[in-house]
From Swiss-Prot:
Residues 562-577 have a biased composition (Low complexity). One of its GO terms (cellular component) is ribonucleoprotein complex. It comes from the Eukaryota. The gene is SHE10. Component of the mitochondria-localized RNase mitochondrial RNA-processing (RNase MRP) composed of one single RNA encoded by the NME1 gene and at least 31 proteins. Absent in the nucleus-localized RNase MRP (NuMRP). Residues 379-416, 513-561 form a coiled coil. Residues 525-545 have a biased composition (Basic and acidic residues). GO terms for biological process: sporulation resulting in formation of a cellular spore. This is Outer spore wall assembly protein SHE10. Residues 1-23 form the signal peptide. Belongs to the SHE10 family. It comes from Saccharomyces cerevisiae (strain RM11-1a). Involved in spore wall assembly. May be a component of the mitochondrial RNase MRP (MtMRP), a ribonucleoprotein endoribonuclease involved in the cleaving RNA transcripts to generate primers for DNA replication in mitochondria. Keywords: Coiled coil, Mitochondrion, Ribonucleoprotein, Signal, Sporulation.
């Protein structure tokens, strides 16, 4: 069981690689065997075949296969194509140039046998494995019944081609036989009048089934030779006299007229039968064409969207990088301002003005940090980041609108292609049916019953024609309203919007943290300023109180001095008395 799984996996990989090579080199494959191998290993070919011949497969498996094929065309194939181009450009071409330049210097003749021997062994090994495991399964699949069915299909296509060729040749004949017939009759009359002893001329009859030439020539005055040649390469020679030759010529004209009537009847029958068969194929052709146009539309849309999103992804990557750099500059500016809130005041020795230093006192700052200044920094940061994010959202909306317009343009282009194809098909079928009606009117049978049957068939065919025309119109409407796969566009838009929202939230949270930190710094500075002012106020009050005490003490000292002086004067006066 494990070997069978490995074999199936190997065959799947080989078939996938083969199909990719066939599709990549579709315009440069000249070998018929390679083209046949590419055709019969294409899963889409077998899907179409089984859908037409197996109702269960058509209802159960084919829809899933179409979905997988569409996903492959839209999601996997563009990635593989880009990877192939990149690998070819980055690795294969440079390596080939290097190898080619080195091989010019080598004498590879002596290495030929060394390389050829392992390759021969490998080829024999693969052939042995193929004959042992793969070929029996292929022989079981390609049975006699399948081959006979395939042969019938090919013969049917061949008959249809032969039918169209016959119709074309008859159209040409119907236009020019009347002129040729009149010319032959005039020439025969002239020859009869001029030569009473012999007949010189030719009678040509071209029925649809075979080409026959009846030639009458006069060899002698008493003898004639009549030679009849057909496509069976049978030659009959008859010797007639003059009167018998004339009778044969007249009989040839009668045979031609009767044969034309029979051929017209055959044409009428074959036309009706083939027309009824082709109507069934017409419906399948319309469905297949509709499916092909839808696949082409989805492929073009996928290719355009892939290239557009890759381009815009690079642009938005640069925009997000610029947004991140600008936000870091604003945040750094605010952080420095917050750190400088706790600054140190000083006096310039030269000018005597106040100057400010950072909290370490080593670096001078440009200005004193206030609440109004920090609030201005926050508002500038918030407004700038909002402008940048709004511009990115606007660009994203414009890109989405541009993609939708381009998708609609691609859809309209494919619808126009289908309309042109439908107009040509309808015109060709209307001409063909009108041609069949003309044949029925002028070359129909004399029997009334047969005429009624032909009229009934013509009515049925015209109804089928109208049904096919309505089917084309419905298919056109289906193409016009077929929704494109914009899932990658929506995913890209959601991804960018999510990233913008994430950046907005992160920047808002960081600004909130910085604002809280700034408030704490300002509150701490204000607290210290209040304490300093209280200390200064207390020191001033203490100084004033000390001054008052000193003044009071001085006043008391002055009063003591005045009292001592008065006492001395009084004592002196008393003693004098």
């Amino acid at each position: 069981m494990g070997k069978l799984i490995k074999l199936i996996t190997t065959l799947t990989v080989l078939v996938s690689l083969l199909q990719y090579c066939c599709e990549f080199n579709s315009g440069s494959i000249s070998c018929e065997r390679t083209q046949t191998l590419c055709h019969y290993t294409n899963p889409r070919v077998w899907n179409t075949y089984f859908s037409r011949n197996c109702e269960l497969y058509k209802n159960k498996v084919s829809p899933g296969f179409d979905i997988v094929a569409r996903k492959y065309d839209t999601a996997v194939k563009p990635v593989i194509d880009d990877a192939t181009v990149k690998v070819n450009k980055v690795a294969i071409q440079p390596a080939f140039k290097v190898i080619h330049s080195q091989c010019k210097k080598w004498n590879c003749g002596k290495y030929y046998q060394l390389v050829r021997s392992p390759m021969v062994k490998t080829r024999r090994f693969f052939f042995a494995k193929y004959n042992a495991f793969v070929k029996p399964n292929i022989d079981k699949f390609f049975t006699a019944e399948f081959r006979s069915h395939l042969k019938e299909r090919i013969l049917k296509c061949k008959n249809i081609g032969h039918y169209y060729f016959t119709i074309t040749s008859r159209c040409i004949k119907s236009k020019y036989d009347f002129i040729v017939g009149n010319t032959e009759e005039k020439l025969m009359g002239k020859f009869k009048n001029k030569d009473t002893h012999g007949i010189h001329g030719s009678v040509t009859h071209e029925p649809s089934s075979e080409d026959m030439v009846l030639t009458v020539s006069t060899m002698e005055s008493d003898e004639e030779e009549l030679t009849t040649t057909s496509t069976q390469t049978v030659v009959e020679t008859i010797t007639l006299d003059q009167e018998e030759a004339s009778a044969v010529a007249n009989h040839a004209h009668d045979d031609e007229a009767s044969t034309d009537v029979e051929d017209s009847t055959d044409v009428n029958v074959n036309e009706q039968a083939l027309l009824q068969e082709d109507f069934d194929m017409w419906s399948e052709t319309i469905l297949q064409k509709t499916q092909d146009v839808i696949q082409l539309f989805e492929k073009d849309v996928s290719k355009y969207i892939h290239g557009k999103l890759v381009e815009e992804a690079n642009h938005f990557k640069a925009k997000f990088q610029s947004l991140d750099d600008k936000s870091k500059k604003f945040f750094s500016k605010i952080s420095l301002a917050i750190n400088d809130i706790e600054c140190v005041e000083g006096i310039d020795s030269e000018t005597g003005k106040k100057i400010f230093f950072d909290k370490s006192g080593s670096t001078e700052i440009s200005q004193y940090i206030t609440r109004e200044l920090v609030r201005e920094y926050f508002n500038e940061t918030r407004s700038t980041l909002d402008e940048l994010t709004n511009a990115m959202e606007k660009d994203l909306s414009e890109i989405t609108d541009e993609i939708e317009k381009k998708v609609n343009a691609i859809r309209e282009e494919n619808v126009e292609v289908f309309e042109e194809w439908g107009d040509i098909i309808v015109n060709e079928w209307s001409k063909r049916m009108a041609y069949v009606d003309v044949i029925n009117a002028h070359m129909g049978a004399d029997d009334d019953t047969t005429l009624d049957e032909e009229k009934a068939k013509s009515s049925v065919n015209w109804k089928k024609f109208l049904k096919g025309k309505k089917q084309i119109i419905e298919s056109r409407d289906k193409l016009a309203h077929h929704s494109a796969d914009l899932s990658r566009v929506n995913a890209f838009r959601q991804k960018v919007q999510k990233k913008i929202l994430s950046f907005t939230q992160e920047s808002g949270e960081f600004l909130y943290i910085l604002r809280s930190k700034a408030n704490l710094q300002f509150q701490e500075r204000e607290r210290k300023e209040r304490e300093r002012k209280e200390r200064e106020k207390a020191a001033a009050e203490e100084f004033q109180r000390q001054q008052e005490l000193l003044l009071q003490q001085e006043e008391e000292d002055e009063e003591d001095v005045s009292y001592t002086s008065t006492s001395t004067i009084t004592t002196t006066t008393t003693m004098t008395l």
